[in-house]
Amino acid sequence: IINPDVTLKEDAIDNFFFSIKKVENFGIIAPVSKNEKYSNFNLDLDKDIKEVQNVKGFAMFLNMKNFKEIGFFDENFFFYFEEIDLCKRLKNNNIKIYIDPSIEVSHLGGTSHNEEINKPMELSRNWHWMWSSFYYHKKHFGYMSGLMKILPKLLSSIIKFIIYLIIFNKFKSDVYKYRVLGIINSVLLKKSWYRPKF
């Protein structure tokens, strides 16, 4: 799986096939990116393959036979947490996840959409981040646990929405309004329905 803003280095595929000879029962082997903001791994560390709890989803090599029992991505997620959820289900079934620093990609990050539609995408991003955050915690730890996790974010978003509304910062007030709406929809068990308006 590769995001549209990711390019594989020339030796990435060869290094991947070398990696699978070193590990057993893997579900995911992920590469690293030199883009520090979107990297899977601290590149200052050694080059050995390492077992981890989860990886970022910009590029992943999947061992498909290990997904027959647990399923693939949860389609209830539209943006965010889908790879964390996938990794959680793998780990719950004792299937290993690795990062291999010898497999390198170029990941621009944040460029998968046109700059002209930044505001609608930013509003959508915030809506879905909050929706997915509650849904993930509810799914794996229960409704009340998810509620306790998301409540501070809800209160913070409401306060910031009011502050930015008072000082006439429409963009910021809209961002926090959409955060609140994302949380409310998720807590009310509504689907991840919101789509950006252009």
Task: Give the ranges of each region predicted by the language model.
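A short, conserved alpha-helix in the catalytic core of glycosyltransferases
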Residues: 59-62, 66-71, 75-106
